[in-house]
Amino acid sequence: MPAISCDPAAARAFAIVVVERLRAAGHEALWAGGCVRDELLGRTPADYDVATSARPDQVRAVFGQRRTLAVGAAFGVITVLGPRGAGQVEVATFRSDAAYTDGRHPAGVTFTDAREDALRRDFTINGLFLDPLTGTVHDYVDGRADL
């Protein structure tokens, strides 16, 4: 199976559009995880994740059923498919996790806010959020100090 090529500039532009569209629909939306780390270190992110106050059904309503995959909806995660060459963006609802029964998946999730979401993440660096429209970093866990 051939590799799917993704233009880094197109991927970044699409990740910004995802944030803009979620906000236009009345939801909080920020970049999260590795893309924030890479941006702060001056690197080109390999992919983009967005954390949002929108619930999975609301994310699907914003982007449409044909442009979304609900493979992680039980955990608040929807994949939004970009235009050709732009890749995809994982959009996760801010959440806190119940206990992990298998080491990988929580027994349940509770949708919450950005601060609570940052506290559940595995590394402080992954708890950083970035507003791509203003450049503002939201650091609830002192993750920037660990860069």
What is the meaning of each model-derived region?
Residues 1-147:
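Catalytic cores of the polymerase beta-like nucleotidyltransferase superfamily
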